[in-house]
């Protein structure tokens, strides 16, 4: 069994969104305020924590601000139920011919009729159908919050995390034996005895004339919480003596905190399904550790799926749902595991509102060849392709190097808001001319939603190549109902040719001679010695003859533009920059 889909209505940023989830691992990616954490919180409300101690409760503030009714609703569809589970969850199975169960959760805001708010849980086809007693206990969750300071979480005297571990490992009937084992010695040191004597004498002089008092300084009766507050985590590199947690870096301290939560998964065998919710596991971790964390989580899910189910015992399945802002993590997993969460603006009764939308890559209907190409690209480049709602696709690294400096220094100079919008645009060098897979994944719709609102493609016209790349891509966007979302800008030849032809001969001469200091005669003979209209072509031949790499030339151009040298931006590049900077 696994949570197959989650429909969230009127909950925070989610007006009415359905999020599809994979049986083993789902990674929620996308921009800030896209709704990733709200999906996690919805699962926390719908299901019970594995520990039995609920930490997330509904609040009036959870109801979406622009909702027409003062409640929110969460509905989960659980799939791949076996015959035994269908029997145990019979009240939650709306259609006996399908191996699915439905559980729902509704919260109504506080009112005169319900001064504390009203929570309703239902199962099956109708939201008036109460779950059978004990059925919700079969589905649990473990929550790992985003860690900003593991030193604080592990090293303070509150003992919260240690207490959770003690409760996990210590049976209730063994608690007193444990406390006896860690209790302080009955004998008190001489210093403490002397202190008590002196305090008693002083107190006696103050109270003997009225009502004599006695006092003693001693240890309090120890409870399990007292022990938890006294215990401290220590850690060091393997082979060294563990030190106080604050001597370790935040990254490894975060991993230690994760380890203290992961051990709770051992109890997953007591539930049929445990959903492990992990928010931003990449915090303070370098890329290799990020990958190891996600690999470990995926292994937990797969091992639970491979485990043989014993008759009469829970299935013990583990399902992972993680959120991330890390391109490293999205690159490591298959795109099939990725669900893009993003915000979309729309008009509601004359008021502009934003809402979360969900785009599961696995359900876009992409061909395997397209998915493979996207997967390989993300794996190699660690690109932020899926993290923004506007993107510029370019052929190679040269355009990607030049666009930011041209935007900041020239095209958008003086337009602070436009520059910020441009900075929020993802620039994707695909190192080729096959833009189709990237346009497909960014513009193909799912339930009326798509990853990108604005997509700009910059490419060469390539007159020697059959077909028209611009028309082909525009037709593709129209097929997906997004002709307004795509802009294809082409030059007449190549990037270097267009830069020269825009009126940058003197600029390129300076740059070329910086790269090839002993080639002044070559420039004079091969560029200045030909007709003006032929010089752009001659420049291409010269840099090819000198084996000038496109990336090196682009770096040199960007450096001089940044230094303030006069430069004319080719019109098609200026159009691309302005298009990305539009509000």
Task: Go through the PLM ranges and name each one.
Residues 129-202, 206, 236, 478-481, ...:
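Coupling/switch segment of ABC-type P-loop NTPase heads
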Residues 48-71, 271, 303-316, 348-349, ...:
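Flexible phosphate/Mg2+-sensing switch loops adjacent to catalytic phosphate-binding sites
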Residues 315, 333-583:
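Acidic, divalent-metal-binding catalytic cores of TOPRIM
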Residues 153-156, 163-278, 299, 305-307:
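Extended helical coiled-coil dimerization/tether regions that scaffold
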Residues 1-28, 33-48, 234-381, 567-568, ...:
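Switch/communication elements of ASCE P-loop NTPase nucleotide-binding domains
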Residues 78-84, 111-112, 148-151, 239, ...:
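Conserved nucleotide-binding/hydrolysis micro-motifs of P-loop NTPases
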Residues 40-97:
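Conserved P-loop NTP-binding catalytic core
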Residues 96-148:
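Mixed-charge intrinsically disordered linker/loop segments at interdomain junctions
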């Amino acid at each position: 069994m696994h949570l197959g889909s989650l429909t969230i209505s009127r909950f925070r940023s989610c007006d009415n969104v359905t999020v599809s989830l994979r049986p083993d691992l789902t990674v929620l990616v996308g921009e800030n305020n896209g709704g990733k954490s709200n999906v996690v919180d919805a699962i926390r409300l719908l299901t019970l924590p594995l520990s039995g101690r609920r930490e997330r409760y509904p609040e009036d503030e959870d109801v979406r601000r622009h909702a027409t009714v003062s409640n929110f609703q969460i509905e989960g569809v659980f799939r791949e139920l076996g015959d035994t589970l269908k029997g145990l969850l019979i009240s939650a199975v709306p259609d006996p011919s399908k191996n699915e169960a439905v559980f729902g959760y509704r919260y109504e805001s506080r009112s005169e009729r319900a001064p504390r708010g009203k929570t309703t849980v239902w199962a099956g086809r109708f939201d008036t159908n109460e779950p059978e007693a004990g059925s919700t206990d079969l589905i649990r969750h473990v929550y790992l919050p985003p860690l900003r300071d593991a030193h604080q979480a592990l090293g303070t005297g509150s003992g919260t995390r240690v207490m959770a571990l003690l409760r996990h490992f210590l049976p209730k009937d063994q608690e007193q034996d444990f406390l006896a084992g860690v209790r302080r010695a009955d004998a008190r040191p001489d210093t403490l005895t002397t202190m008590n004597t002196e305090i008693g004498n002083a107190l006696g002089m103050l109270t003997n004339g009225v009502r004599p008092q006695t006092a003693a300084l001693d240890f309090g009766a120890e409870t399990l919480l007292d022990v938890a507050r006294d215990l401290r985590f220590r850690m060091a590199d393997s082979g060294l003596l563990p030190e106080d947690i604050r001597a370790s870096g935040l990254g490894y301290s975060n991993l230690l905190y994760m380890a203290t939560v992961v051990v709770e998964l051992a109890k997953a065998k007591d539930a049929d399904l445990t959903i492990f919710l992990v928010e931003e596991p990449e915090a303070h971790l370098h890329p290799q550790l990020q990958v190891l964390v996600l690999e470990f989580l995926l292994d937990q899910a797969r091992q639970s799926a491979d485990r043989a189910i014993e008759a009469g015992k829970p299935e013990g399945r583990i399902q992972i749902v993680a959120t991330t802002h890390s391109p490293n993590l999205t690159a490591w997993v298959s795109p099939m595991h990725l669900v893009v969460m993003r915000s979309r603006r729309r008009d509601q009764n004359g008021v502009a509102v934003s809402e979360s939308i969900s785009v599961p890559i696995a359900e876009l209907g992409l061909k395997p060849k397209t998915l493979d190409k996207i997967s390989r690209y993300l794996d190699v480049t660690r690109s932020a392709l899926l993290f923004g709602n506007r993107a510029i696709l370019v052929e190679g690294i040269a355009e990607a190097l030049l666009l930011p400096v041209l935007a900041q220094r020239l095209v958008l100079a003086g337009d602070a808001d436009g520059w910020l919008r441009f900075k929020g645009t993802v620039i994707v060098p695909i190192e080729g001319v096959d833009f189709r897979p990237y346009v497909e994944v960014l513009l193909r719709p799912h339930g009326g939603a798509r990853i990108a609102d604005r997509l700009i493609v910059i490419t060469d016209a390539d007159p020697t190549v059959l077909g028209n790349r611009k028309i082909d891509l525009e037709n593709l966007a129209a097929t997906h109902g997004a002709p307004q979302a795509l802009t294809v800008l082409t030059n007449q030849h190549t990037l270097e040719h267009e830069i020269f032809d825009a009126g940058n001969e003197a600029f390129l001469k300076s740059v070329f001679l910086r790269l090839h200091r002993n080639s002044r005669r070559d420039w004079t003979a091969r560029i200045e010695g030909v007709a003006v209209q032929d010089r752009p072509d001659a420049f291409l031949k010269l840099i090819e003859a000198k084996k000038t790499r496109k990336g090196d030339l682009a770096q040199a151009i960007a450096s001089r533009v940044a230094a303030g040298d006069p430069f004319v931006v080719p019109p098609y590049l200026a159009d691309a920059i302005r298009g990305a900077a539009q509000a």
